[in-house]
A protein has these predicted regions:
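Helix-rich effector regions associated with P-loop NTPase G domains
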Residues: 1-12, 18-21, 37-40, 74-82, ...
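Phosphate-binding glycine-rich loops and their immediate beta-loop-alpha structural context
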Residues: 118-186
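Beta-strand/loop nucleic-acid-binding surfaces
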Residues: 61-78
Length: 335
């Protein structure tokens, strides 16, 4: 509509909004809200990140890219689907530019123990988390396992546990902690790697491998992928291993992807909330809808509906409550 009255306009009192003000030719131009459409650009998957350089796989091969300025705060991680412009030749010294990051189906993240509010995204768009633990030397860590599982379930990932060195110790008591949880368990020996069943579980999926140093993760990754990642020994005094992976890296399988991550001895749960975990236990979540507001869903919690007779297997309920306590302890430390 023009700023002049047109025939048929309803008359009204004039005010300052009816005055047309000529724009100041020396003033700054208003920013447009329109953004470029990058959907037609070539697409790739981030394979690894090294400082500000991203190795990206496109349909024409592997290239090196950097992030567009407006994406630097968000950042891209291994597994991200990204849209590219610039030099896509992949020649030595060439550099493409990541101008858009596609929607993330899943996002695995952690926080450092001393930075509870600073979450670190690790891998995007993965399907499952493979947790590698040794039956002995070093001993399995139930606290770390619970953190891995809580993060996986809250992120929408399936979980796999791979127990190595089962020829040294079977760890039956440790594995009893997992009764009732939706997790596949595989076992390997130091003297032989029978990986047929494990490979079937990895087929057609993007699987993130995690585990602290010395459990045999790099050796296992080498056997599965045919790569030659460095492996490390366990210190006889401390019982701890040396980190042999320095950054997350996506490695192709025959039908799928294996994403190796650096070994860590801590895995902070960052800002994951109780409701995030409940989303992975739909049968339990349905019952907790009847719980009083603010219910902690523990055995000692008064009026908790989970304490009434129900069809949830006791082992599954106990495992859920153990994971929930891990989250509650983390939330308490953040206060």
């Amino acid at each position: 509509m023009s700023w002049l009255y047109e025939p048929g306009d309803q008359k009204h009192d004039l005010d300052e909004s009816d005055v047309r003000i000529r724009p100041n030719p020396k003033g700054s131009r208003p920013r447009t809200k329109r953004r470029p459409n990058y959907d037609a650009l070539p697409v790739g998957m981030v394979l690894t990140v090294n400082l500000a350089r991203y190795q990206v796989l496109t349909e024409n091969g592997e290239i090196t890219a950097t992030l567009a300025k407006e994406l630097r705060k968000q950042g891209a991680v291994v597994g991200d689907q990204v849209y590219l412009d610039g030099d896509l030749t992949g020649d030595k010294g060439s550099l493409a530019r990541i101008v858009k990051i596609g929607p993330r189906k899943t996002l695995l993240r952690r926080s450092a123990e001393d930075e509870k509010f600073n979450e670190q995204p690790i891998v995007a768009n993965a399907d499952q988390l493979a947790i590698v633990m040794a039956s002995a030397n070093p001993d399995p860590n139930i606290g770390l396992l619970d953190r891995y599982l809580a993060s996986a379930f809250a992120s929408g990932l399936d979980a796999i546990l791979i127990m190595t060195k089962t020829d040294v110790e079977e760890a039956k008591e440790f594995l009893e902690n997992l009764q009732g949880l939706p997790i596949k368990i595989f076992k390997t020996r130091s003297d032989s790697f029978k990986l047929k069943d494990l490979k079937k579980s990895l087929s057609g999926k993007k699987t993130v491998f995690v585990g602290y140093s010395g459990v045999g993760k790099s050796t296992l990754v080498n056997a599965l992928t045919g790569t030659t990642l460095d492996t490390g020994d366990v210190n006889a005094v401390t019982g701890k291993g040396k980190h042999t992976s320095s950054a997350a890296k996506a490695i192709p399988l025959e039908d799928g992807w294996l994403i190796d991550t650096p070994g860590v001895r801590t895995f902070g749960l960052g800002l994951i909330e109780k409701d995030d975990l409940l989303g992975a236990f739909e049968d339990i979540a349905e019952i907790t809808n009847e719980c009083p507001r603010g219910c902690e869903h523990q055995l000692e919690t008064a009026n908790c509906v989970l304490n009434e007779e129900n069809e949830i297997p006791l082992a599954r309920l106990n495992s859920f409550r153990r994971l929930l306590k891990v989250l509650e302890a983390e939330q308490w430390e953040r206060r």
